[in-house]
């Protein structure tokens, strides 16, 4: 059942992407560098200490003056070690490190019509949300049988800044809400087992991307009143 769901989502992503590529007059491509981070059984709150390198490439189509569609591939390292909150966590003393690969499609909403040549606005804050598939690999002895390909809901926000009619910069932070509790290889288990390799199976693991990107547009802001030249 879950395999069928993943196939349908992948088909949807590909269909939408090909449809949007046809609208070349509103197209953009970009790449970015940043970090993956994680919260779960080992680390309860976001901790910059566990940020690990990641990179992304993406395609964007502007559907209106404030709404855009984006398809992206993001990959990098993700991992953490135990941040003890009690005696049990100290005994468990677990850690993990994976290579994570993500494909996502999201819709973006910009609060300002920053591409309007009649306005002297070089920046806009924005929000985004969508759907993603991610997979991971690592040298982990699994505590349970599970699939390493899962679905996530990416959402977050950022700021974009225009450099000139063809290039702009972005700073973005996004959370990936998962429906999976084994990203850190720790979840529920037999509490009679004295190896302590179990956690809270009622709280799923989540991961995050914080990054900086540069974008190249394939359209030009009209020149007569262009404030960026």
Regions found by a protein language model. Give the residues of each.
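Short glycine/proline- and aromatic-enriched beta-strand/turn motifs that initiate or cap beta-hairpins
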Residues: 23-62, 211-224
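Residues that define the transmembrane beta-barrel architecture of outer-membrane proteins
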Residues: 25, 49-53, 99-103, 123, ...
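Repeated loop/turn-to-beta-strand initiation elements of outer-membrane beta-barrel proteins
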Residues: 27, 65-69, 115, 166-169, ...
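Residues on the lipid-exposed face of transmembrane beta-strands in outer-membrane beta-barrel proteins
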Residues: 31, 57-61, 105-109, 129-133, ...
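Transmembrane beta-strands of outer-membrane beta-barrel pores
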Residues: 33-39, 75-79, 111, 131-137, ...
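Extracellular loop and loop/strand-boundary signature of outer-membrane beta-barrel proteins
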Residues: 39-45, 88-96, 140-145, 197-200
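Gram-negative (and chloroplast) outer-membrane scaffold detector with strong preference
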Residues: 65-139
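Predominantly the C-terminal beta-signal and adjacent terminal strand-loop region
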Residues: 82-83, 164-229
